[in-house]
Amino acid sequence: MSEFIRNEEVLRLAALGKTYNPGTPLEQQVLHDIDLRLGRGELTALIGPSGSGKSTLLNLIGLLDSPSAGELYLLGRPTHALDDAARTRLRNEAIGFVFQFHHLIPAFSVLDNVLMPLMIRHGKPTPAEVELALELLQAVDLRGFADKKANQISGGQQQRVAIARALVTRPALLLADEPTGNLDTKTAESVFALFRRFNREFGCAVLVVTHDPRLAASCARTVQLVDGRIVSDQANA
């Protein structure tokens, strides 16, 4: 595991805005002047009511969409002027994703699902990459399930596989959109415990969208979004 400098800047948003259908009768501004910084080793919850812009913001941060205003810096690099190929390359190299629905491939083994981002990147994984994937499965208590098909394990186990998959590329930034939305309370707490562990041990910045105030409070920091604006950004006790 490589050393990292805690709080070294991973992400910076400067006056970020997003408007859909600009210049038309359907124009709608959903994000307004968002300023945010995330550092290595920082675990941050993003909360807010439905329709507040959380998913839109996560899509912008994940380089899945482009802002209408402002700038997004990832690892110190401005992203606004990047072409599609460069954005895709930076996203694949620097960002891991965990969603409410795990999107595992049912007919593939648990191990192959974890390795999938590496297979997409450069084909057959190296022995070192396979070993890392197995280490991640060990960390999420699923090493013994490596050869099972993804559709042969429980929903909570599938979400843990998704976390291992998101980390196999050693991303600088991990984005999680309602990752516990379909899980019971005990399983949800175990998933958040994994985020805290990997945030601490891997040194990645983690941003988690959640509707659960208890889980948000377990993060080091909570950012609240209302009507497309950050109304609160505070450390948790």
List each language-model region with its residue ranges.
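ABC-family P-loop ATPase nucleotide-binding domain
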Residues: 1-19, 232-237
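ABC family nucleotide-binding domain
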Residues: 8-11, 16-218, 222-225
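H-loop (His-switch) and adjacent beta-strand-loop-beta switch element
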Residues: 222-235
